[in-house]
């Protein structure tokens, strides 16, 4: 089974590099002006790269496969990283691709050269947008794939019985809002702040915290020992960055004589 799988992978790689070298051989002179895709056109280009051939694109994703042939490096990248969907292929020279590994987040600026068509391990057809990279950045989820498009600095601290909760800031990024919270416990007992159960209300609609395993956020604050501090990130999908919202976090103490109320913040 492993031998068949390896042969299938080799066949895919050979087909991929054949397509790359063919496209390189068919290169034309550079246009006087680069025409970039609008953000709203990316989904369509991922489905039909041939219709956008010759245009330029700035796109980010997560690398899931890397292959090399001489000085040429080809990377298969997920655009929709949470669902491992909408792949595209980036090819460039090994110098530009230096430092890229599987699971790296990359942002690519380059020229669309068409669509690659091949088979996956199960014999099903795959199609992928092909991009000849001119520049390539490597980084983390929140600075390369989903950087903050706007930030609300809050810096509000609330205190109950020696437990202080600070809402530091709210970042609005592609498809999500990230709420940065810190807790300091000087109550004399362990306190628990359940950020995983945090809720937001905006325009009468309730939003639940949603995990993002791809981002690697340190999400839940949970138990905070007496004398300790912790930080966490609460993630919501669907919040309007142009409107305020109310954030509620449950809190408890191991000292039954201390009754902690929910920590509630109003973000304008």
Predicted regions mapped to residue ranges:
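C-terminal motif of bacterial Sec signal peptides marking the signal peptidase cleavage site
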Residues: 22-25
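OB-fold single-stranded nucleic acid-binding module
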Residues: 64-145
């Amino acid at each position: 089974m492993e031998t068949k799988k390896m042969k299938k992978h080799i066949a895919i790689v050979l087909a991929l590099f054949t397509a790359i070298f063919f496209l390189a051989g068919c290169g034309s002179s550079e246009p006087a002006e680069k025409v970039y895709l609008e953000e709203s056109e990316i989904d369509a280009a991922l489905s039909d790269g041939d219709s956008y051939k010759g245009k330029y694109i700035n796109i980010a994703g997560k690398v899931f496969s890397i292959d090399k042939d001489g000085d040429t490096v080809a990377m298969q990248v997920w655009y929709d990283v949470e669902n491992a969907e909408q792949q595209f292929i980036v090819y460039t020279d090994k110098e530009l691709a230096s430092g890229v590994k599987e699971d790296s987040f990359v942002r690519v600026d380059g020229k669309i050269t068409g669509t690659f068509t091949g088979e996956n391990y199960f014999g099903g057809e795959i199609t992928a947008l092909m991009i000849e990279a001119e520049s390539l950045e490597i980084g983390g989820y929140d600075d390369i794939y989903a950087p903050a498009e706007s930030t609300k600095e809050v810096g509000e601290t609330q205190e109950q019985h020696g437990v202080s909760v600070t809402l530091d800031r709210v970042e609005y990024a592609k498809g999500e809002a990230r709420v940065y919270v810190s807790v300091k416990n000087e109550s004399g007992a362990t306190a628990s702040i359940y950020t995983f159960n945090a809720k937001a209300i905006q325009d009468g609609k309730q939003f639940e915290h949603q995990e993002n395993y791809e981002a690697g956020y340190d999400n839940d604050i949970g138990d905070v020992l007496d004398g300790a501090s912790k930080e966490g990130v609460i993630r919501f999908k669907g919040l309007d960055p142009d409107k305020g919202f109310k954030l509620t976090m449950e809190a408890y103490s191991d000292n039954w004589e201390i009754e902690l109320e929910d920590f509630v913040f109003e973000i304008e």
